[in-house]
Amino acid sequence: MADKQISLPAKLINGGIAGLIGVTCVFPIDLAKTRLQNQQNGQRMYASMSDCLIKTIRSEGYFGMYRGAAVNLTLVTPEKAIKLAANDFFRHQLSKDGQKLTLPKEMLAGCGAGTCQVIVTTPMEMLKIQLQDAGRIAAQRKILAAQAQLSAQGGAQPSVEAPAPPRPTATQLTRDLLRNHGIAGLYKGLGATLLRDVPFSIVYFPLFANLNQLGRPSSEEKSPFYVSFLAGCVAGSAAAVAVNPCDVVKTRLQSLERGVNEDTYSGFLDCARKIWRHEGPSAFLKGAYCRALVIAPLFGIAQVVYFLGIAESLLGLLQEPQA
């Protein structure tokens, strides 16, 4: 990507198209990942990704799997555009006379891209996590209320079902966070997001560039689209699993609502320490399989759109009548 100059509007459009397609395809898996990561050992409601999705459909309907998708679809365009364009920019700045970047420089470019994207990623994930996890907490409270009613009635079937609490909306959450905490409320978990996204980009972009280079027919030609797709999938899933422990901590820190008897956390280290002590080291890999399934096609699609130059074609069509 460093050897090809692409206009800023094209970068933004390519990133936006890729993000919208990717999020639409994999959002239910991302919802399962959030709920699996947030459930603590004493309050397990879901045994696996498929179990989570089946229970979500039964209790919340098909569209329950897309809770929080509107936030992602709105903000994923600037997020993906910033990430891809920033990496392209840093690679170009670090390259000299079109020479191939060394691995340290590739990692530095990825670091810059990961740092830039958290401007959008942190508030996006902050809102998305509340909306995604609301169904899990509501279901848990409903089960506990039914159990309490059964106990109070001596085992008799409860006659009246407790009404479900109203679901929060992204607008309500944003308004409440800004009113109570200011702009800092939307950026809760910023440090954890940086610790996840910067290492992710350091791993992803150099790995993708080298895998993509392997499938290039010659130094003068672009890689075929399927090579870019596979390179994006492999690099994305590898980077996603590598930083999953930080993603678990970030998800826990950004969750405002807690289930019954669930731990609260004062910061990154406190959260990591409590997870290790109460749930064991395997808890840091919760949702890793889901995250790999989300990230692989997301970045595979992104790289295909980026390398096919869909935005350049669209911009070219718009400019043709003026020629």
Curated annotation (Swiss-Prot):
Main location: mitochondrion
Keywords, sorted A to Z: Membrane, Mitochondrion, Mitochondrion inner membrane, Repeat, Symport, Transmembrane, Transmembrane helix, Transport
Family statement drawn from the similarity comment of this UniProt entry: Belongs to the mitochondrial carrier (TC 2.A.29) family.
Pfam families named in the record: Mito_carr (PF00153)
SUPFAM superfamilies: Mitochondrial carrier
Source organism phylogeny: Eukaryota, Metazoa, Chordata, Craniata, Vertebrata
Reaction catalyzed: L-glutamate(in) + H(+)(in) = L-glutamate(out) + H(+)(out)
Lineage top rank: taxon: Eukaryota
Annotated function: Mitochondrial glutamate/H(+) symporter. Responsible for the transport of glutamate from the cytosol into the mitochondrial matrix with the concomitant import of a proton. Plays a role in the control of glucose-stimulated insulin secretion.
Biological process terms in GO annotation: L-glutamate transmembrane transport; regulation of insulin secretion
Location within or outside the cell: Mitochondrion inner membrane
Transmembrane stretches, start-end: 12-32, 62-82, 107-127, 189-209, 223-243, 292-312
InterPro entries in the cross-refs: Mit_carrier, Mito_Solute_Carrier, Mitochondrial_sb/sol_carrier, Mt_carrier_dom_sf
Solcar repeats: 6-93, 101-214, 223-312
Annotated source species: Mus musculus
GO molecular function, one term: amino acid:proton symporter activity
GO cellular component terms, semicolon-separated: mitochondrial inner membrane; mitochondrion
Name by which UniProt lists this protein: Mitochondrial glutamate carrier 1
Membrane topology: Multi-pass membrane protein
